[in-house]
Amino acid sequence: MHLFVDISSHGFGHLAITAPVLNALVEIAPNLRLTVRTRLPQAMLAQRLRFPFELIEASSDFGYVMIDATHIDRPASAAAYRQAHANWPARVEKEARFLAELKPDLVLTNVSYLPLAGAALAGLPSLSLSSLNWADLFAHFFAHEAWAA
């Protein structure tokens, strides 16, 4: 079985949540082939992931544009979301083609939604693992904005 895992590079928490799950999966399914896409440092991945994996150094989300570790740059984040969704159907089609070429049996994200949309278009099963998600955070900060409808 081939598992494609997309881990948000927005901090280290997404890896901290995902790594124990992946390590446990590999223990019960040692022949599991894993492809991981993230921009997190390879050294950090090697500390947390106790199995061989193919690394795709890329990011499918940005989370939020941050001023510092605890403050969101709301105007910059709003602009980034508008840009990310300006041509959403084309982005989803590109992601679906990427996933179809990669041929995973399952797509797992923590917690980018682009791979979920691409997997749906490509007819691949997918799921997300997280203690939070961008949709709820987005609604908290931007639901009142006309452009966010």
What is the predicted role of each segment?
Residues I72-L106:
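Conserved nucleotide-sugar donor-binding subdomain of glycosyltransferases
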Residues P125-A149:
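Active-site-proximal region of nucleotide-activated glycan assembly enzymes
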Residues M1-F51:
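N-terminal subdomain of nucleotide-sugar transferases
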Residues F4-D6, L108, L129:
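Structural motif
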Residues L32-A86:
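Conserved nucleotide-sugar phosphate-binding/catalytic loop shared by glycosyltransferases and other
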Residues A19, A119-A122, H140:
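Short amphipathic alpha-helical segments
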Residues P30, L102, A122-L124:
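Helix C-cap/helix->beta junction micro-motif
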Residues M44, V107-L121:
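An aromatic- and histidine-rich active-site surface loop
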